[in-house]
Amino acid sequence: MIQKNTKIISLIILLIFSVNLLAHEESSKRVVILQPQHGENVNQTFKVYFGIEGMTLAPAGTYEPATGHHHLIIDADLPNLLLPIPSSSKYLHFGKGQDHTQLTLIPGKHTLQLILGDGNHIPHKQPLISKKIEITVRP
């Protein structure tokens, strides 16, 4: 009886540890806009630097696990997460695996947000989406 209880307790501890480890692995994956910072004032032409953790940047058309490429959303909402990310002036694709770009925007307030796409430009099953930042472009 004691041996059976010990096995059950061991299995429960192992299960809890596995769930915590899996949750940590998922939470350690993220994309972030490194520069500019939220609330920053920038010139009309400025650089945007992208960060990624827990995944590897790869060109579009790469279908290996834990890889993807950045898409920058400018002044727009998130796209449908089940479809390829649109390509337009509001949804910029960085299909060569780039980690930065230079933008020119009109003066005023703007929002920027990153989303990682897979080899087909579709967000991952656990989408990696940055916080939306707001910047002000100087005249």
What kind of feature is each model-predicted range?
Residues 44, 106-108:
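A glycine-anchored, Pro-Gly-centered beta-turn/N-cap motif
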Residues 79, 117-125:
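Short acidic/polar inter-strand loop motif in beta-rich domains
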Residues 51-62:
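Short amphipathic, basic-aromatic surface patches that mediate peripheral association
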Residues 62-70, 129:
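Short coil-to-beta strand junction motifs in C2/discoidin
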Residues 126-139:
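Short beta-strand elements
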